[in-house]
Amino acid sequence: MNSATSLMCFALLLISPLCMGYTAEDREADSRRVAEIIKNSQDDNSKINSIQELLDIYKRLYPSLTPEERESIDNFVNEHTDEVLVDGVPSQGGRKTKFAGKILSEATKGVATGFFEELGSKLAGLFTG
């Protein structure tokens, strides 16, 4: 009885990581969501407000990317984000855009919308191959 329980626990440990992966359905849903965000973000404010959602999609997509794809997008994102620190340690939310939640000048809006458009096109490119 004890060995059967141990074997069952071991089997669950081996199988559980397979169930938590980024599935093809998740990838397809994120692909549709990126396309929808890009299509529906017509003005500067909607683009700026959608940046965090694009970053969240990238965070979900991250484990399934090649090291080269990760490095390319990470370098781009790191140039335009601040790491949020709480007591010198990254918060659970991680990085936030420099633009979100601020009153923006026209020059900053231009940079933020450019970031949105570039990040959106990079993510869309990952989904289309």
UniProtKB/Swiss-Prot annotation:
Q: Which GO terms describe its cellular component?
A: extracellular space
Q: Where is the signal peptide?
A: 1-21
Q: What is its main location?
A: secreted
**Where does the protein end up?**
Secreted
Keywords from the UniProt entry: Immunity, Innate immunity, Secreted, Signal
Give the GO biological process terms. Answer: cellular response to heat; innate immune response; response to bacterium; response to heat; response to UV
Q: Does the keyword Oxidoreductase apply?
A: no
User: Matching InterPro entries, A to Z?
Assistant: Turandot
Query: Which Pfam families does UniProt cross-reference here?
Result: Turandot (PF07240)
Instruction: Tell me the protein family, please.
Output: Belongs to the Turandot family.
- Quote the function comment for this protein: A humoral factor that may play a role in stress tolerance.
Q: What is this protein called?
A: Protein Turandot B2
Q: Which organism is it from?
A: Drosophila erecta
Question: Gene encoding this chain?
Answer: TotB2
